Amino acid sequence: MKDINRLKIVLVEKKRTGKWLAEQLGKNPSTVSKWCSNVAQPDLATLVKIATLLEVGIQDLVISAK
């Protein structure tokens, strides 16, 4: 599967972990792990929450289709 999000990269840049993000969102850490490895994708509402928590724009979390 082609990578769609940059969540793993942004977490590293912000010095945060998937476990931290899961706790903030009230999600299972395995769900966040799937997002980080691009096995699954968060819905748009969750993506907005993630962007807010990490203090980045949504565009920073998504890989451009160029």
For every predicted segment, state its role.
Residues M1-T17:
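A short, Lys/Arg-rich alpha-helix, primarily the initiator
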Residues E13, Q24, L53:
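Residues within the alpha-helical elements of helix-turn-helix
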Residues K15-R16, P42-A45:
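Residue-level signal for the short linker/turn that defines the boundary of a DNA-recognition helix
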Residues L21-A22, I50:
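Short alpha-helical "recognition helix" segments of helix-turn-helix
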Residues G26-P42:
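Recognition helix of helix-turn-helix/homeodomain-like DNA-binding domains
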Residues C36, L54, V62-A65:
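DNA major-groove recognition helix of helix-turn-helix
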Residues A45-D60:
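DNA major-groove recognition helix of helix-turn-helix/homeodomain DNA-binding modules
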